[in-house]
A protein has these predicted regions:
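Glycine-rich flexible loops
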Residues: 1-224
Length: 224
């Protein structure tokens, strides 16, 4: 909240996370005397007498946010990782795809534009730094996988799966008796030093979409 006010001004309200619904709508309505409102894990809400006025507010506040990030961005801390050779990448992706496809065939795509992020010393913090929105969590999971060239993938992926099971079951216990829910515990995205970001999905379209979503959330975590 402090950062929001510092970046956008005190006339922009901040609302802690609420699930979408009537209560959240009521809270936003109570902020009508403010210039705009930022909803935690949802985004920016603006208004005006015309759609153009509301749109211009959005552009204005986005520029303020970008300027704040630019002025407060930490220096990128890259490692000495070099881009892997084609044969090294192919072998790694074959191991990765094989492990992810044990229950259902997966397609894997690579986003080389995230190579600088994957090569940073704090890559673990970037991968586990949280998602930008709840939709991102639903699409690509809570955390990204981090995997190295020499990894056989099996142990790394199994440890991530077990951790996600524990995380999921902790909240499943709070649901009504008899409630059942199945969830895909496979990592959907990950950062690979020397390669970039991988995205996995049952189709090439889904795999590419996952890397695009991951780019937003990884860049956000890197700028914190």
């Amino acid at each position: 909240e402090e950062v929001i006010h510092e970046a956008l001004g005190n006339d922009v309200a901040f609302v802690p996370y609420y699930r979408p619904g009537f209560m959240l709508s009521k809270i936003v309505q109570q902020c009508s005397d403010k210039y705009a409102v930022v909803l935690e894990h949802h985004g920016l809400v603006t208004w005006g007498n015309t759609h153009e006025e509301s749109y211009l507010k959005t552009i204005e506040l986005e520029k303020k946010a970008q300027e704040y990030i630019k002025n407060h961005k930490t220096k990128k801390d890259t490692t000495s990782h070099h881009k892997l050779q084609t044969d090294q990448i192919e072998k790694l992706l074959l191991r990765l795809r094989g492990q992810l496809s044990l229950n259902q065939k997966q397609i894997i795509t690579i986003d080389e534009n995230q190579l600088n992020l994957a090569n940073r010393n704090d890559v673990i913090q970037i991968a586990t730094g949280g998602r930008s929105t709840l939709e991102h969590i639903l699409r690509i999971g809570k955390d990204s996988l981090v995997i190295s060239e020499g990894d056989d993938c099996k142990e790394t992926i199994q440890s991530v799966q077990e951790a996600y099971k524990k995380y999921f079951n902790k909240y499943l216990e709070k649901l009504p008796a008899g409630f059942d829910m199945h969830v895909n515990i496979n990592p959907k995205v990950g950062l690979i030093p020397g390669v970039g970001c991988f995205g996995a999905g049952i189709s090439l379209k889904e795999a590419k979409r996952n890397t695009e979503i991951a780019k937003h959330t990884h860049e956000g975590a890197a700028n914190v």
